[in-house]
């Protein structure tokens, strides 16, 4: 990051931040997309098992990932204020938090997975796939969370193009392992949907090794001597990250949990509905990379300017991100509505699943459009370290609005599984309105204080 003096310079810098982040997010989500696509081609039962397992681990990972995002605005504001001496200590505390979160997730899986699957009453064959898929995924759990600390540190320094290159490399590894292990190619065993778990684990270790090399050898990062001058846990730094990260993690958890809960509600309608629903979720997740990347770039750009006490410039970056988000929302709608048949056929050869995907897409496109407008606002607020209100808005919108509507309508014969999507759509509309109000308030408050 560096100071800019005109709107065009800010736009160019924002695009330079956003573009590599977008490609990075596409690669991260692309691994899941490919896994769902290939597993769907293998069998509907395997897809149902992998989809259920994915919904379960995603629920916990999203919370952990969001919590670890607390490091980003801290480092961005320190760089803006040119106070970098404490950055190495902050990175080490991020490692300690990541390790603790990984241990908690692992213990929950060991003791809670089988009882939960029994409660869901998933088909026995799909249950077996789900359990083995999650066991394979667990091999990459620790590096998956360690990488979040490393990547957030790299991105905070504006080195997003390096993150892009690393994650694209791991994406290639993921695709290769998925294809080889699901179908049994290149001398590897054919293990169906379980291969998707090994694919993720392999990608996680690839990411960790490459990001570790990055912080060891890049000129802007090697001065921090990560892995060389180890720092013990320091509560004041851990507390600062958790004070910012826990509200972020909780707010993202509330949003992500509605997808997992929605997926689990779909289990009661059979494997075909689960497969169709997860296919549409995989498709919407691909488009979610765009607003999410805008949000992440906004956190860095806004946080940098706030750290330098240039509040008007921070507002200009927020306007750039919001206009870009609206343009993306329009493009998402236009593309999806003109390609619904092709998109539906992409995921399955089963006629029943195809028809369900086609109908779910009508809801999914509007969900993606409204989410594209609301998500960047969260990134702007994180740049101001205004994270507690994001927590409350997410709680109200996703659990206070989505969950009851989805549950009630899903149990209504007139709506069934489509009621779940109505609840999802209602939640992002409410969240977008509330985030818009809060962003306007906090920005005008900052300008008033400076004046």
Predicted regions and their residues:
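Short alpha-helical transmembrane segments in multi-pass integral membrane proteins
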Residues: 1-22, 75-142, 188-246, 302-367, ...
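Signature of the first transmembrane helix
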Residues: 12-72, 76, 246-268
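Transmembrane alpha-helix boundary and packing residues in multipass membrane permease domains
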Residues: 21, 25, 33-37, 54, ...
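Residue-level hotspots within pore-lining transmembrane alpha-helices
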Residues: 23, 27, 31, 60-64, ...
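Helix-terminus/linker motif at the lipid-water interface of multi-pass membrane proteins
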Residues: 30-48, 117-124, 180-191, 253-286, ...
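Structural signal for membrane-spanning alpha-helices in multi-pass inner-membrane proteins
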Residues: 36, 109, 178, 182, ...
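Small-residue-rich hydrophobic transmembrane alpha-helices
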Residues: 36, 47-110, 144-163, 263, ...
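Short runs within selected transmembrane alpha-helices of multi-pass transporters and secretion channels
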Residues: 68, 137-155, 163-174, 196-212, ...
């Amino acid at each position: 990051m560096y100071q800019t003096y005109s709107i065009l310079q800010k736009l160019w810098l924002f695009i330079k931040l956003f573009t590599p982040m977008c490609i990075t997010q596409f690669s991260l989500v692309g691994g899941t997309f490919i896994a769902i696509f290939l597993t769907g081609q293998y069998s509907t039962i395997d897809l149902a098992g992998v989809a259920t397992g994915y919904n379960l681990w995603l629920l916990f990972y999203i919370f952990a990932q969001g919590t670890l995002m607390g490091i980003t605005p801290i480092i961005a504001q320190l760089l803006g204020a040119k106070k970098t001496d404490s950055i190495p200590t902050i990175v080490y505390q991020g490692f300690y938090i990541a390790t603790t979160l990984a241990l908690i997730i692992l213990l929950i899986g060991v003791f809670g997975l089988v009882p939960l699957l029994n409660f869901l009453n998933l088909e026995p064959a799909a249950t077996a796939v789900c359990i083995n898929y999650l066991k394979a995924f667990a091999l990459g759990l620790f590096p998956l969370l360690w990488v979040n600390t490393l990547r957030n540190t790299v991105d905070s320094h504006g080195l997003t193009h390096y993150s892009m290159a690393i994650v694209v490399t791991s994406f290639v590894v993921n695709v290769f392992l998925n294809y080889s292990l699901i179908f049994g190619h290149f001398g590897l065993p054919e293990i169906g949907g379980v291969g998707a778990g090994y694919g993720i684990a392999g990608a996680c270790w690839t990411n960790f090794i490459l990001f570790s090399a990055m912080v060891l050898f890049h000129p802007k990062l090697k001065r921090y001597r990560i892995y060389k001058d180890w720092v013990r846990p320091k509560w004041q730094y851990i507390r600062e990250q958790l004070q910012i990260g826990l509200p972020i993690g909780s707010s993202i958890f509330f949003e992500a949990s509605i997808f997992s809960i929605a997926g689990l509600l779909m289990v009661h309608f059979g494997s075909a509905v689960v497969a169709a629903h997860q296919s549409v979720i995989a498709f919407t997740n691909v488009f979610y990379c765009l607003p999410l990347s805008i949000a992440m770039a906004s956190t860095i750009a806004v946080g940098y300017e706030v750290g330098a006490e240039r509040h008007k410039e921070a507002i200009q970056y927020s306007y750039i991100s919001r206009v870009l988000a609206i343009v993306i929302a329009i493009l998402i709608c236009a593309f999806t509505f003109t390609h619904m048949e092709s998109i539906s056929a992409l995921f399955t050869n089963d006629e029943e699943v195809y028809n369900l995907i086609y109908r779910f897409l009508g809801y999914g496109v509007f969900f993606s459009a409204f989410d594209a407008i609301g998500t960047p606002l969260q990134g702007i607020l994180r740049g101001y370290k205004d994270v507690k209100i994001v927590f409350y808005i997410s709680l109200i919108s996703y659990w206070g609005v989505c969950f009851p509507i989805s549950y009630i309508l899903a149990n209504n014969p007139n709506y069934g599984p489509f009621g779940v999507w109505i609840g999802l759509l209602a939640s992002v509309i409410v969240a977008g309105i509330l985030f818009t109000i809060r962003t306007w308030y906090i920005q005008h408050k900052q300008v008033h204080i400076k004046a």
